[in-house]
């Protein structure tokens, strides 16, 4: 277990029979430092990495250390042995954990302070022995990228890995993913994987796993709980529900959005209720919405995407020539508009849209408001856009509509068939009924 340490640091640990995960005390001058020895990812071979009681990780140079004392051995050795056995044989696992990168599998680079996607899912499991109390897991690192670098071709690889995991006998899948584009991937998987045998749970964290305020551990424990106990066969996002560590929420993958840049409870269901909440301390899943897709017998895979689609966020003063260039001088096959209010753009673009739809380009309308649905029959401009061939997309989120369009374009060439699929509720991306409690209200009392 000292394999992450090299040269002199390795020799010191080996001679004292100290391994990663052991509680140790280091004396350096008048300073005594007690904490758990962590793996070192430092390029400096003379650094020990210690997790303190307050949750912070520190690097300590071996120079001028007068004493290193072993306090207690790692208590999770037996569980670790079981984890290794499970990892060697995926058929023994119940839940597959697929790592794609992101903050939940990131480490701080102590030379620079930067966060890098270097921690594998297996290493997270090593520091979360509680996972074995929930289910037997098997970990796989599919790739290690930051979520802003996600691409449609990666969605295909993730979908294929999920299908393989179910074919191997797993009853649920957890996908560790960066939070910034998690909703895009969740949508892509929802359209690509049908008749799911069990839940597919995307999970991430807003703060890396070596920070004292990290949400990594709770989110991952909650995700495995969801994958183990959920009665549904759907793609979902499992994240913190509040700014403390009370519980997590499970959101339908095509009705969720990251609504804050840094808060741990950044994810919120939009135009829909969360499917469930997870009481992570009790390892308990509480269903909040019974209108879910049940588990099926065999998962089907249909992961194809055509990225000749464009998401346009309309704004006053949008240059007409720029829009015309997109519609006439590129290879675009479809345009999703995030319009104002009930689904509008300036009437200046109506004839551009009319020509584009006549040329076979699909144009769909969503709302920048996010909450609520488009209704283009209310005002004159909306009716003009309808007449020009713009298709209203109900209460679909703009990003979901974009991913859906990419999936539809890969399956259909005919514009009317594309329209038909885009307005069809395939995986719960359209909620036909809105109630008052779907809109969040902020109280200032």
Curated annotation (Swiss-Prot):
CDD domains in alphabetical order: GatD
> Out of the domains of life, which is the source?
Archaea
Catalyses which reaction(s):
L-glutamyl-tRNA(Gln) + L-glutamine + ATP + H2O = L-glutaminyl-tRNA(Gln) + L-glutamate + ADP + phosphate + H(+)
Q: Which residues form the Asparaginase/glutaminase domain?
A: 93-425
Q: Pfam families, from UniProt?
A: Asparaginase (PF00710), Asparaginase_C (PF17763), GatD_N (PF18195)
Which EC number(s) are documented for this chain?
A: 6.3.5.-
Q: Which PROSITE patterns match?
A: ASN_GLN_ASE_2, ASN_GLN_ASE_3
Q: Which InterPro entries match?
A: AsnA_fam, Asp/glu_Ase-like_sf, Asparaginase/glutaminase-like, Asparaginase/glutaminase_AS2, Asparaginase_C, GatD, GatD_N, GatD_N_sf
GO terms of biological process kind: amino acid metabolic process; regulation of translational fidelity; translation
**Gene3D superfamilies, per this entry?**
2.30.30.520, 3.40.50.40, L-asparaginase, N-terminal domain
One example GO MF annotation: asparaginase activity
Give the annotated active site. 103, 179-180, 258
Keywords, sorted A to Z: ATP-binding, Ligase, Nucleotide-binding, Protein biosynthesis
Give the multimer and partner information. Answer: Heterodimer of GatD and GatE.
HAMAP family to which the protein is assigned, alphabetical: GatD (MF_00586)
The job of this chain, per UniProt, is described as: Allows the formation of correctly charged Gln-tRNA(Gln) through the transamidation of misacylated Glu-tRNA(Gln) in organisms which lack glutaminyl-tRNA synthetase. The reaction takes place in the presence of glutamine and ATP through an activated gamma-phospho-Glu-tRNA(Gln). The GatDE system is specific for glutamate and does not act on aspartate.
Family classification: Belongs to the asparaginase 1 family. GatD subfamily.
Q: What is this protein called?
A: Glutamyl-tRNA(Gln) amidotransferase subunit D
């Amino acid at each position: 277990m000292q394999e992450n340490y090299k040269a002199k640091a390795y020799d010191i640990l080996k001679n004292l029979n100290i391994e990663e995960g052991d509680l140790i005390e280091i004396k350096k001058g008048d300073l005594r430092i007690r904490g758990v020895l962590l793996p070192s990812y430092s390029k400096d071979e003379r650094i020990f990495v210690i997790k303190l009681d307050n949750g912070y990780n520190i690097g300590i140079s071996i120079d001028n250390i007068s004493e290193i004392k072993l306090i207690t051995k790692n208590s999770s050795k037996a569980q670790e042995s079981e984890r290794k056995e499970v990892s060697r044989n995926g058929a023994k696992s119940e839940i597959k954990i697929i790592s794609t990168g992101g903050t939940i599998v990131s480490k701080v680079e102590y030379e620079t302070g930067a966060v890098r996607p270097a921690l594998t899912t297996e290493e997270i499991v090593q520091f979360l022995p509680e996972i074995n109390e929930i289910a037997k897991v098997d970990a796989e690192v599919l790739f290690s990228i930051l979520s802003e670098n996600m691409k449609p071709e990666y969605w295909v690889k993730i979908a294929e890995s999920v299908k393989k995991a179910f074919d191997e006998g797993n009853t649920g899948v957890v996908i560790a993913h960066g939070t910034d584009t998690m909703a895009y991937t969740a949508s892509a998987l929802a359209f690509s994987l049908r008749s799911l045998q069990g839940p597919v749970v995307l999970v991430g964290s807003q703060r890396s796993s070596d920070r004292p305020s990290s949400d990594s551990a709770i989110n991952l424990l909650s995700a495995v709980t969801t994958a183990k106990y959920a009665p549904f066969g759907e793609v979902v996002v499992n994240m913190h529900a509040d700014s403390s560590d009370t519980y997590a929420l499970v959101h339908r993958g095509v009705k969720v959005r990251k609504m804050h840049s840094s808060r741990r409870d950044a994810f919120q269901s939009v135009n829909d209720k969360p499917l469930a909440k997870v009481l992570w301390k009790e390892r308990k899943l509480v269903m909040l919405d019974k209108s879910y897709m049940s588990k099926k017998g065999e998962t089907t895979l249909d992961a194809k995407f055509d990225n000749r689609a464009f998401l346009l966020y309309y704004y006053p003063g949008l240059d007409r020539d720029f829009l015309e260039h997109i519609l006439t001088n590129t290879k675009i096959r479809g345009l999703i508009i995030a319009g104002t209010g009930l689904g509008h753009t300036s009437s200046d673009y109506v004839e551009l849209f009319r020509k584009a739809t006549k040329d076979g380009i699909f144009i769909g309308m969503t709302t920048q408001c996010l909450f609520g649905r488009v209704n283009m029959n209310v005002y004159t401009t909306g009716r003009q856009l309808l007449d020009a061939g713009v298709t209203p997309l109900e209460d679909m989120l703009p990003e979901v509509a974009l991913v859906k369009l990419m999936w539809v374009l890969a399956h259909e060439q005919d514009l009317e068939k594309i329209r038909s699929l885009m307005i069809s509720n395939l995986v719960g991306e359209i909620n036909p009924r809105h109630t008052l409690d779907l809109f969040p209200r902020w109280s200032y009392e």
